[in-house]
């Protein structure tokens, strides 16, 4: 697995920090987070770029009781069973990606999704305070992450915001490369 801690700074000022908020996030942070949540299925194509990536996401619980990989698109406070957790005020941890992710595409796609959230003032909804590994069936309407690479590539292909941010030619080339790898695997 892999994760990224995300905050936005203006000089020495953390723009994601709001000490008056219960989780310590500013309105800006929530909108940025909303963009990441909205685009999560498409981001999965960058964050989980191999067939084995989806074996990790869909892995059964281990002896510890968890795979420590998210499978639902959700966020929470300091709880590692969700795709996004807020461990401390002023930042959030995105837990979706794995070690096969290209670090440059990872950062660029998080920024593109976050900027979409800021531009469109996307509300991420309420955080869920539960153990998603045990309680996921209580949330049947909660969006799930793609089960396979080809599903996330299809989401990316049809995501106008990501196509605008990266350019359609770059997205098409990325998808073509991943599809060639899928074809070789089969």
Regions found by a protein language model. Give the residues of each.
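Active-site capping/gating regions of soluble enzymes
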Residues: 1-128, 137-138, 142
């Amino acid at each position: 697995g892999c994760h990224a801690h995300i905050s936005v700074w203006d000089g020495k000022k953390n723009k994601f920090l709001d000490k008056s908020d219960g989780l310590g996030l500013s309105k800006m942070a929530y909108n940025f987070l909303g963009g990441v949540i909205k685009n999560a299925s498409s981001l999965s194509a960058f964050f989980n770029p191999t067939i084995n990536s989806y074996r990790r996401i869909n892995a059964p619980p281990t002896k510890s009781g968890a795979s420590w990989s998210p499978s639902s698109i959700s966020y929470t406070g300091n709880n590692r069973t969700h795709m996004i957790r807020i461990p401390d005020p002023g930042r959030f941890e995105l837990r979706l990606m794995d070690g096969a992710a290209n670090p440059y595409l990872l950062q660029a796609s998080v920024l593109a999704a976050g900027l979409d959230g800021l531009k469109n003032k996307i509300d991420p909804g309420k955080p869920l305070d539960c153990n998603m590994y045990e309680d996921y069936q209580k949330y049947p309407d909660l969006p799930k992450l793609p089960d396979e690479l080809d599903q996330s590539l299809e989401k990316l292909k049809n995501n106008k915001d990501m196509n605008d941010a990266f350019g359609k030619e770059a997205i098409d080339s990325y998808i073509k490369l991943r599809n060639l790898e899928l074809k070789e695997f089969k």
